Structures are given as structure tokens and as C-alpha cells.
Amino acid sequence: MAPPHFLLVTFPAQGHVNPSLRFARRLIKRTGARVTFVTCVSVFHNSMIANHNKVENLSFLTFSDGFDDGGISTYEDRQKRSVNLKVNGDKALSDFIEATKNGDSPVTCLIYTILLNWAPKVARRFQLPSALLWIQPALVFNIYYTHFMGNKSVFELPNLSSLEIRDLPSFLTPSNTNKGAYDAFQEMMEFLIKETKPKILINTFDSLEPEALTAFPNIDMVAVGPLLPTEIFSGSTNKSVKDQSSSYTLWLDSKTESSVIYVSFGTMVELSKKQIEELARALIEGKRPFLWVITDKSNRETKTEGEEETEIEKIAGFRHELEEVGMIVSWCSQIEVLSHRAVGCFVTHCGWSSTLESLVLGVPVVAFPMWSDQPTNAKLLEESWKTGVRVRENKDGLVERGEIRRCLEAVMEEKSVELRENAKKWKRLAMEAGREGGSSDKNMEAFVEDICGESLIQNLCEAEEVKVK
């Protein structure tokens, strides 16, 4: 009996590609399924995919978004890419489904990530089941779903105070200027609202968001996370790091336990020159050792209005002072750093992957959200999971150095015992969910069984056991 064949299409951005690939690998390992991973040529040109080409039952299909070498920087570029994604992506999926339907391994189900609203329509055209792989928390999905159902009232959950405007995904706030993102979420949610019991695969775990995962009885929400590298759950640290790793790991080795502040805002978020200076001054004045990752964002899609300097150029005037207290690197293995005994605090933009990593590795945070789902993630970290302290902006939207120092001292001193105890609790629960045979593996098996039938999944699991023996 042929294994089920999943067509998994993902938006061409690192924050979408990484969890999607991890989901694909876990799906294959746990159920013996075949996965064809579909994305843009640019993903391969920009080296977003590594160490996946030799995975059995995992193959790749690419199409062009018109920007094969990247370089998207203007609104017009993004509009053009959106059109190309829809036209070329639709054709690539349709041609593949058509070409395989009478062969040994026809497509069983189509899985897609956010911002690809045309993908489930292809599945519907070919009468295939589809599922959305939601790479943000379940609560954020619920906020969007509730909003576009026409209920604009405040969304509430037990143990979480009412959401203020500052807690909402930025695309739903009155100050949102990204109409394209708002329209994309609206189209996606309106499609799902019309579906009968749509399946949403969510990068979370059962014990982290139990209320949010069961908020809508008409939606089949399946927790399949945390979608993080398997090394975390097996207990082995990934040592395949880049050139700078020896310098920062040796530096961390020289520090005492829980004494270092790790600062990283990911690859997409860029701080203004004023904000960079306030953060730098807070770190200098605090006199605690820190490791600050400042990446090259010269090819970023979103730039700070009126500023052409890179972040590394913005700190030039006080870099010497910074390096007297801490260390600045252009890249590090975040998982390796967060796993290090010396790290006691993570200053993060609260992207969902970074948020999950902080929970899984048990590191308290200073939540410094910027846009998209990050404000909601920060709310959850501070109030629901109680593993961090969130910064507050002034009336001009700037987080001042005094506020940053307040939060750092709270995490490193005043609330350190409470926050670390909570972080340990979530680390244990996350490990239980993410380990082989944990709740997320079981949820994944149930999803495949639901799609393909109970007898097929039993046969596949038995075949996998024989193969292992």
C-alpha cells in the first residue's frame, strides 16, 4: 500500500520555511508519509534550505516568484511577487497534482502556510483535502478568526486580562499601514469561515494553549509543535555552527551561570537609530555581560523610514563602550546560545520561533515586540506563561533606556526566581510534547489517520517498525 503523499507549500521566508521543513520531517518520520515540499526558487538561492536533501520520502518542487535572487525592497516589488506567487504557484501545484494523479503516489492532501490564499483553492479544484499550517500561536489565529467573523469585540481567555490595542497583531490595529497584509489575512479567514470543520495544524503544544486550541468547536485545531530542531528534544546540541561560533562560545564559557543577557531581534526586525542608542545605553549602564546579535539587514524588505544606515553602522559611535561590557556578533546559533548555562535573560522581539525557543530551553525574557503577532506573543509571555517582562513604549513609540534597564533588572534580579521557576515548568512541558512519541507526534498521527483512514496509518506504522528493526 502506497504511503500518503502530502503536498506542502510554504511562503518564501525563513520564518515560514524552517517550521514547515521541520513539520515535513516529523510527518515523514512518524507516519512514513511522502512529502513534496513546494516553495520558490529564491529559497534555494538564499540557502534557506540545508541538510534536507537526503531525507528519505522528502522531495522538492520549485517555482519562480520573479525574484529568484531575492532583492525585494519596495512596495512595487512585493506587489509583483504576490502576483507571481499566485499565478506561478497555482500552475506548479496544478501541474504536479495532474501529473501524479494516475501514478503510484498521487497527492493525498495539500498543506499550506499563511499568505498563500490561492493554495487551498487549488486543492478544492482537484477535490483534495487541505490543511493550514499556522506558524503562529493558536491565540493569534483565534484573534484573526474572531475579527473577520465580524466580532470586533475584545477576545478574552482565562488567566489572561482583556487584550488592549497594544496586545493585538499589528495588522489589526488602527495604526496599521500594511493594507496588503490585512487583506491577505481577511481573505484567508473568510475562506476558512466558509469551510466545514477546517483543519488547522498549529505550531504550539497542547499544554501551552489548551483554551485557545478548543475555542472554536467548528474548527479542527491540531497542535503539532514545538516545530524546532530535533536535537533539542533528543538532548544533543547541534554543533554545526558558523565561523564566529568559537569566539562567542568561548566567551560564554568564561561567564558565570545565568549572568549573560542575550539580545537578538531576528533577521526581519530593524531598530531605529534612536532605539538602537537607547538599548545600547541601557546595556552599557547596566554593566552586565551581554551577547548582542546585529545581523546584516541591508537586503531587508522593511526599512526604518528615513534611515539608510544598517544597524551595525548605527552603533559605530559607541561600539567601543559596548564591547567593554559585552560582545557583538553578526551571527550565532541561537539554540546553542540559549542552551548555554551562562545565559540568564533573552531580550527578544517575540517572533514565534524565538518565543518557542525561549520556552523550550527555559530562558526568561525581556519581551520587546515590534509588529505582526509579536505583541500578542509578548502578552502571553508576561501574563499567561509568566516567563518574562514586557517593555513599555513612551508616547512617541520609543522604549527608553530607563525602561529597558527596569525590565533587565526585573528578569536578572527582582523577579528572577519566579520567572526561572516558570521557565523550568514550561521547558519540561515543551520537552514532553515535542519528544518522539509525545503529544504532538500523537496529534500528527491522528491528523494523518483522519485524512487517510485508520487502516492505512496502522500499516504504515508497522512498516516503519520493521524498517527500524
Curated annotation (Swiss-Prot):
Highest taxon of the source? Eukaryota
Q: Which reaction does it catalyse?
A: (indol-3-yl)acetate + UDP-alpha-D-glucose = 1-O-(indol-3-ylacetyl)-beta-D-glucose + UDP
Q: Which residues cross the membrane?
A: none
Binding-site residues for UDP-alpha-D-glucose, renumbered to this chain: 334, 349, 352, 354, 357, 373-374
Annotated EC: 2.4.1.-, 2.4.1.121
How does a null allele present? Answer: No visible phenotype under normal growth condition, but strong reduction in 4-aminobenzoate glucosyltransferase activity.
Q: What GO biological process, any one, is recorded here? A: para-aminobenzoic acid metabolic process
Keyword tags:
Cytoplasm, Cytoskeleton, Glycosyltransferase, Transferase
Which InterPro entries does this one have?
A: UDP_glucos_trans, UDP_glycos_trans_CS
Q: What does this protein do?
A: Possesses low catalytic activity on indole-3-acetic acid (IAA) in vitro. May transfer UDP-glucose from sucrose synthase to callose synthase for the synthesis of callose at the forming cell plate during cytokinesis. Has high affinity for 4-aminobenzoate. Catalyzes the formation of 4-aminobenzoate glucose ester which represents a storage form of 4-aminobenzoate in the vacuole. Is the major source of this activity in the plant. Also active in vitro on benzoates and benzoate derivatives.
Instruction: Give the protein name, as stated in the record.
Output: UDP-glycosyltransferase 75B1
Q: Which organism is it from?
A: Arabidopsis thaliana (Mouse-ear cress)
